[in-house]
């Protein structure tokens, strides 16, 4: 089905290009189709045949008229194309013995204003549609959307309906059928596109839309058998307009009802965009041409002029089909309602004044003038806001310019680094905008003591406002007005509140709603900025204290140890995946070679065999050492089975190599720890054992790890040589106690060491859970 519609779409594109080329040639040459000319016995040009709906009939020509002059010249073959009149500005004809001068041929000459709506705009619309079609085909190479082909057909349908609606080729019978079918079927194609488009995003719309094609086919049949049925041409025109209006209103209602049903669905914004484009496109044509013709027989604006906004439909659909990001339709609708309300009042005043003073243009009735001035006013208000936003034009003086002042204030807050700077910028902003001359900052303590913060300035007598200071501290942004100004809470810290007192030399008027809203916004911005500045100041003080103490904070130690463990793990993986695997492979090759070598008869066999055996043993030692190194760098058992199993393996490995006895007791350890804490405890015990091997000369080592209530206790004890803590500070550092202490601090624990020369070494570590 998709391949069939694809081929059909391509065929329609080719046929449309041929049709547009044909109509363009007719328009460029001003050929009046439907008005057949031939020479009579006297070699006079006579109108032999004229179609009912042709442009020749529209300008007043009748069958049997004899043409005396064309463009004030004697008729000749140069004024004919295919037997039809062409390039006509005026005609002098003879009818029933009377000479008649006809000159109303504006619609067939491209140098007239009417040609813009009859030929230029429709042709421009067609070429834009072709560009959009190629863009849709390009995008659809990846999407492979069925809706894309229906959208292409819709673009071509509206383009052909628009360009075939008028001009010198109106009398062409085939052109009339093409215009009728494409004109009435455009709302149906529109609904089919919406159905397919929503279906491809998983939404249902309408079923059996194809049955609606019965309406244009029925109208086409009546048009075809018009003479046989003896149907009046005015009735046919009304029937066609009623059919189009019915289908258009049906499509609009279907989309609206679907939106009302799924107003909170994720695709509701798509439906709103469809309703917007539908209304803007069809409403002018329906209101100013179709409905007036149906009910009164006269139109307000000509069909081609009122239908010019139909171009919004395909472009809106193309944008919706290819765009990755949509405009905010709620915002657009809100702005349109706002601009429409603003434009309505001056429009009614202007038109009312024109009617009252009787200065109305003859060609512009009150309805036309109302529409014209409304559109102009609407466009003026829209472009005014666009220009204001784009160039940030100052619509007011700096006083009372609340929005710009907030924007400027937030920009200034980005560069403040102290509380005094925050207060300074706040005071300057308020003094620039409001009718106050002075601003002061105060701190109100929890016991309602008022402290003046601007020490470098002469402060006011704030004792008059003691009660107001007590009442204003209830919430941030609260404002209390006094005779010559107001008080406002702008922030808090702990139990203290920061209050701004703004005064004037004279009694100030009451604050307006806009001013109160603006001040509250400023106070909230100030409160956030104060919190940030205070946090930064506290952090700087804390860093200074740490620098003086010469120790790193716990969070930094944890980070450093985490980075160290990550580096250890990476190195262990590299050793295991590269060096260790190469060694194992080399050892395997050596074993195979040694096995083959024993089978051969070689006088030097024993000597070479001994060397190979020695090399094999050395490789075994290297492999074993590499494995142990990988395990020490990254204790895989700890990651897989936990701390207790990893410690048991660590003690077992150490026991094979050390000259002393190691006892490990973890039976009462049941705490659940995160991986970082387990790694730190593992490294601490590993460091204790390493120190015992290097320095203790012990014969017995005891390690106990227990958990009691919300506490973890690690006890280490050996009977080695010990050391004097007071005299041997450097020695203790060399024993690795520095790393142990840092890890204990990272765990937020406490380390207690008992040792002296010749009396062994004891260490207790307590960690709160």
UniProtKB/Swiss-Prot annotation:
Signal peptide: none annotated. The keyword Transport does not apply. It is found in: Cell membrane. It is an enzyme of class 2 (transferase). PROSITE patterns: HIS_KIN (PS50109). GO terms for biological process: establishment of competence for transformation; sporulation resulting in formation of a cellular spore. Sensor in the two-component regulatory system ComP/ComA involved in a major quorum response pathway that regulates the development of genetic competence. Plays a role in sporulation, at least partly interchangeable with that of SpoIIJ. Probably activates ComA by phosphorylation. Its main location: membrane. The gene is comP. Residues 34-113, 168-235, 296-299, 358-361 are extracellular. Residues 571-769 form the Histidine kinase domain. Its EC number is 2.7.13.3. Autophosphorylates on a histidine and transfers the phosphate group onto an aspartate in ComA, thus activating it. The modification Phosphohistidine is found at residue 576. This is Sensor histidine kinase ComP. The chain crosses the membrane at residues 10-33, 114-134, 145-167, 236-257, 273-295, 300-323, 338-357, 362-383. GO terms for molecular function: ATP binding; phosphorelay sensor kinase activity; protein dimerization activity; protein kinase activity. SUPFAM superfamilies: ATPase domain of HSP90 chaperone/DNA topoisomerase II/histidine kinase. InterPro entries: HATPase_C_sf, His_kinase_dom, Sensor_HK_TwoCompSys, Sig_transdc_His_kin_sub3_dim/P. Keywords: ATP-binding, Cell membrane, Competence, Kinase, Membrane, Nucleotide-binding, Phosphoprotein, Sporulation, Transferase, Transmembrane, Transmembrane helix, Two-component regulatory system. SMART domains: HATPase_c. It is a multi-pass membrane protein. PANTHER family: NITRATE/NITRITE SENSOR PROTEIN NARX-RELATED, SENSOR HISTIDINE KINASE COMP. Residues 1-9, 135-144, 258-272, 324-337, 384-769 are cytoplasmic. Gene3D superfamilies: 1.20.5.1930, Histidine kinase-like ATPase, C-terminal domain.
């Amino acid at each position: 089905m998709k391949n069939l519609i694809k081929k059909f779409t391509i065929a329609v594109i080719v046929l449309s290009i041929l049709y547009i080329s044909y109509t363009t040639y007719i328009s460029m040459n001003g050929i009046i189709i439907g008005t057949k000319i031939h020479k009579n016995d006297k070699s006079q040009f006579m109108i032999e045949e004229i179609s009912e709906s042709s442009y020749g009939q529209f300008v007043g020509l009748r069958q049997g008229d004899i043409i005396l002059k064309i463009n004030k010249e004697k008729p000749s073959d140069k004024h004919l194309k295919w037997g039809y009149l062409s390039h006509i500005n005026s005609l002098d004809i003879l009818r029933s013995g009377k000479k008649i001068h006809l000159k109303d041929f504006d619609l067939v000459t491209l140098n007239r204003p009417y040609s813009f709506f009859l030929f230029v705009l429709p042709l421009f619309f067609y070429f834009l549609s072709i560009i959009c079609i190629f863009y849709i085909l390009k995008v659809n190479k990846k999407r492979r959307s069925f809706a894309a082909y229906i959208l292409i057909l819709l673009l071509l349908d509206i383009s052909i309906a628009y360009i075939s609606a008028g001009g010198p080729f109106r009398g062409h019978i085939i052109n009339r059928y093409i215009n009728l079918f494409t004109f009435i079927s455009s709302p149906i194609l529109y609904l089919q596109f919406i159905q397919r488009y929503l279906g491809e995003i998983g939404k249902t719309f309408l079923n059996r839309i194809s049955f609606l094609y019965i309406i244009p086919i029925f109208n086409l049949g009546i048009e075809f058998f018009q003479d046989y049925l003896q149907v009046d041409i005015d009735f046919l025109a009304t029937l066609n307009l009623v059919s189009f209006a019915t289908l258009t209103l049906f499509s609009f209602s279907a989309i609206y009802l679907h939106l009302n049903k799924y107003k909170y669905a994720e695709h509701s914004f798509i439906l709103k965009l469809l309703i917007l484009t539908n209304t803007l496109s069809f409403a002018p044509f329906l209101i100013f041409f179709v409905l007036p013709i149906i009910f009164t027989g006269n139109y307000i604006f000509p069909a081609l002029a009122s239908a010019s906004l139909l171009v919004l439909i395909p472009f809106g659909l193309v944008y919706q089909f290819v765009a990755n990001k949509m405009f905010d339709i709620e915002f657009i609708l809100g702005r349109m309602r706002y601009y429409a309300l603003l434009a309505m009042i001056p429009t009614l005043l202007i038109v009312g004044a024109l009617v009252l003073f009787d200065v109305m243009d003859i060609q512009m009735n009150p309805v036309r003038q109302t529409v014209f001035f409304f559109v102009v006013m609407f466009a003026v208000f829209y472009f005014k806001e666009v220009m204001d936003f784009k160039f940030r034009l100052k619509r007011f003086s700096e006083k009372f310019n609340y929005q710009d002042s907030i924007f400027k204030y937030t920009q200034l807050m980005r560069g403040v680094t102290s509380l005094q700077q925050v207060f300074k910028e706040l005071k300057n902003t308020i003094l620039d905008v409001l009718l106050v001359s002075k601003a002061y900052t105060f701190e109100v303590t929890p016991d309602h003591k008022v402290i003046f913060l601007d020490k470098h300035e002469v402060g006011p007598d704030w004792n008059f406002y003691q009660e107001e200071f007590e009442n204003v501290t209830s919430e941030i942004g609260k404002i209390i007005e006094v005779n010559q100004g107001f008080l406002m809470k702008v922030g808090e810290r702990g139990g203290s509140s920061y209050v701004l007192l703004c005064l004037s030399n004279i009694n100030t008027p009451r604050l307006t709603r806009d001013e109160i809203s603006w001040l509250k916004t400023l106070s909230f911005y100030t409160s956030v900025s104060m919190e940030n500045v205070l946090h930064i100041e506290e952090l700087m003080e804390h860093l200074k204290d740490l620098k003086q103490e010469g120790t790193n904070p716990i969070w930094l130690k944890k980070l450093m140890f985490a980075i160290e463990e990550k580096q250890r793990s990476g190195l262990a993986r590299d050793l295991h995946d590269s060096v260790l695997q190469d060694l194992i492979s080399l050892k395997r090759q050596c074993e195979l070679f040694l096995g083959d070598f024993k089978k051969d008869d070689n006088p030097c066999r024993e000597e070479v065999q001994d060397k190979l055996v020695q090399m094999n043993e050395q490789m075994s030692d290297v492999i074993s050492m590499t494995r142990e190194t990988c395990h020490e760098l990254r204790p895989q058992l700890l990651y897989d089975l936990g701390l207790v199993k990893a410690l048991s393996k660590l003690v077992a490995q150490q026991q094979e190599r050390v000259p002393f006895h190691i006892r490990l007791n973890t039976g009462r350890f049941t705490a659940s720890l995160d991986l970082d804490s387990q790694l730190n405890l593992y490294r601490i015990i590993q460091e204790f054992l390493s120190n015992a091997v290097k320095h203790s000369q012990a014969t017995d080592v005891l390690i106990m790890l227990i958990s009691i209530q919300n506490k973890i206790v690690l006890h280490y004890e050996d009977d080695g040589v010990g050391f004097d803590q007071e005299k041997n500070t450097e020695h203790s550092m060399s024993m690795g106690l520095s790393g142990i202490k840092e890890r204990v601090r990272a765990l937020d624990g406490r380390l207690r060491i008992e040792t002296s020369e010749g009396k062994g070494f004891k260490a207790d570590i307590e960690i709160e859970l």
